[in-house]
Regions:
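A cross-domain feature marking catalytic cores of carbohydrate-active enzymes
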Residues: 77, 109-112
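Serine-dependent acyl-ester chemistry module
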Residues: 72, 78-85, 115-134
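Catalytic His-Asp segment of secreted/periplasmic serine-dependent ester chemistry enzymes
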Residues: 120-193
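Extracytoplasmic/secreted proteins, especially bacterial periplasmic and envelope-associated proteins
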Residues: 7, 17, 21, 69, ...
């Protein structure tokens, strides 16, 4: 195995075993620490269960091969936070980037997409899919640039699709199996540059 990757995120990361797909594409070891609905901020907070797990994985103890010595930490935030609270998103990105670098890993921000037009969650936010996608792109791009993370811009990638219906699961938020494959390939391409 070549690369060793720690992925942190929520169900947008875990859906359809996307970390396993990424591992296969890169012939890498991928350790995923996820919790449905999680915000990125909790992954760098040692007082949370997920934060404690991340620190344990990064610190490693030598007894488990899957812990410690990661080349990359790939981080994904709550599905709408870069659009709805970009300052909170940027603070979380700053902390996870610092944590990754403190453990000699390169930080990668996996920026997610706007919700599908017509989805219930998008209606709740009171914006169009195009507006959300643009805000997701801007919020994540700004955070990644400010803190020196490699940026995987899924908001832009999905927004540029002529027909993105195949990308989404039925809820209009999560990726379909083909969508998760596309996300994994996009991340792999970014790491291979």
């Amino acid at each position: 195995m070549g690369l060793s990757i720690l992925m942190v995120g929520n169900s947008l990361t875990a859906a359809n075993a996307m970390p396993t797909i990424l591992a296969s594409l890169l012939d890498a070891q991928v350790v995923a620490i996820t919790r449905g609905g999680a915000r990125l901020a909790e992954f760098s907070n040692p007082l949370t269960k997920t934060g404690s797990r991340v620190l344990q994985a990064l610190d490693g103890d030598g007894a488990q091969a899957e812990h410690g010595c990661f080349d990359y930490v790939i981080a994904q935030d709550m599905s709408h936070l870069p659009a709805t609270n970009p300052s909170a998103h940027e603070r979380a990105v700053a902390k996870i980037c610092e944590l990754a670098r403190d453990h000699n890993a390169t930080p990668v921000l996996y920026g997610t997409w706007g919700y599908r037009e017509g989805s219930a969650k998008l209606k709740k936010l009171g914006m169009s899919a195009a507006q959300m996608g643009q805000l997701m792109h801007e919020g994540s791009l700004r955070a990644a640039a400010a803190h020196g993370a490699i940026f995987v811009d899924m908001a832009k990638a999905v927004a540029q699709m002529e027909d993105a219906s195949w990308f989404y699961a039925a809820d209009g938020v999560h990726p379909s199996p083909a969508g998760s494959q596309f996300v994994a390939q996009t991340i792999a391409d970014a790491l291979n540059r």
